[in-house]
UniProtKB/Swiss-Prot annotation:
Belongs to the PsbZ family. The lineage of its organism: Eukaryota, Rhodophyta, Florideophyceae, Rhodymeniophycidae, Gracilariales. Gene3D superfamilies: Photosystem II PsbZ, reaction centre. The keyword Plastid applies. It comes from Gracilaria tenuistipitata var. liui (Red alga). May control the interaction of photosystem II (PSII) cores with the light-harvesting antenna, regulates electron flow through the 2 photosystem reaction centers. PSII is a light-driven water plastoquinone oxidoreductase, using light energy to abstract electrons from H(2)O, generating a proton gradient subsequently used for ATP formation. GO terms for biological process: photosynthesis; photosystem II stabilization. This is Photosystem II reaction center protein Z. It is found in: Plastid, Chloroplast thylakoid membrane. Coiled coil: none annotated. PSII is composed of 1 copy each of membrane proteins PsbA, PsbB, PsbC, PsbD, PsbE, PsbF, PsbH, PsbI, PsbJ, PsbK, PsbL, PsbM, PsbT, sbX, PsbY, PsbZ, Psb30/Ycf12, at least 3 peripheral proteins of the oxygen-evolving complex and a large number of cofactors. It forms dimeric complexes. Keywords: Chloroplast, Membrane, Photosynthesis, Photosystem II, Plastid, Reaction center, Thylakoid, Transmembrane, Transmembrane helix. It is a multi-pass membrane protein. Its main location: plastid.
């Protein structure tokens, strides 16, 4: 079970890094917000889901 939590945290860190880099680049690029809005919202939803799933799985570990 511990390896699952470690894997989830690793995925969360990688995904967070991608969002931290990708979202400001999207905002800084002219016209990209309209094209990438759905992708950013989807990414934020996936990130939120990862946080909740990681917390839920972690609650089963002593």
């Amino acid at each position: 079970m511990t390896i699952i939590v470690q894997l989830l945290v690793f995925i969360l860190v990688i995904f967070s890094t991608l969002l931290v880099v990708g979202i400001p680049v999207t905002f800084a690029s002219p016209g990209q917000w309209e094209k990438s809005k759905n992708l950013i919202y989807t990414g934020a939803g996936i990130w939120t889901g990862l946080v909740l799933i990681t917390g839920l799985v972690n609650s089963f570990i002593n």
